[in-house]
């Protein structure tokens, strides 16, 4: 199983925003117990979203924490290629997701059926084929 992270989940974890960070950590632990060989995946959009606030605030320490996560050798990257963008457009039309969310959903679907989308946004559940775990 490949766990695809939406930006909010990782931002809560890396930045340690409580009580959200503890909740996300606990839910990820539960998912990991159910899928012990789980790998992590992200999109380039996710990379951008996670870096914006630390860069805007000149927060080198937080940026370094994100960069440490993004340089993990076991991390699976989903690039924003033509197939992803075309699928995102269809998802946006069918399900009314905002463009960034449609891009995330389309990116996750590139991973095949053995994926979990970890997000705090329940709107992803509207997308057929997405295996969503809503992080509360």
Question: Which positions does each model-derived feature cover?
Answer:
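Short, well-structured N-terminal submotif of metal-dependent ribonuclease cores
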Residues: 1-42, 54-68
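Short, flexible helix/strand-to-coil boundary loops that buttress conserved ligand/catalytic motifs
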Residues: 14, 54, 92, 128-131
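An alpha-helix initiation/capping motif
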Residues: 44-45, 82
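Conserved N-terminal glycine/acidic-rich loop preference
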Residues: 66-69, 74-86, 96, 125-136
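Active-site neighborhoods of divalent-metal-dependent phosphate/nucleic-acid chemistry enzymes
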Residues: 75-120
């Amino acid at each position: 199983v490949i766990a695809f992270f939406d930006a909010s989940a990782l931002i809560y974890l890396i930045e340690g925003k409580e009580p959200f960070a503890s909740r996300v950590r606990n839910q990820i632990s539960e998912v990991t117990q159910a899928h012990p060989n789980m790998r992590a995946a992200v999109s380039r959009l996710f990379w951008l979203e996670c870096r914006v606030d630390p860069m805007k605030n000149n927060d080198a320490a937080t940026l370094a924490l994100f960069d440490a996560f993004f340089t993990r050798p076991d991390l699976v990257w989903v690039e924003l290629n033509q197939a992803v963008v075309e699928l995102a457009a269809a998802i946006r039309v069918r399900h009314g997701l905002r463009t960034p969310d449609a891009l995330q959903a389309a990116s996750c679907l590139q991973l095949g059926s053995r994926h979990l989308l970890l997000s705090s946004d329940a709107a992803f559940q509207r997308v057929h084929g997405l295996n969503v775990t809503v992080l509360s």
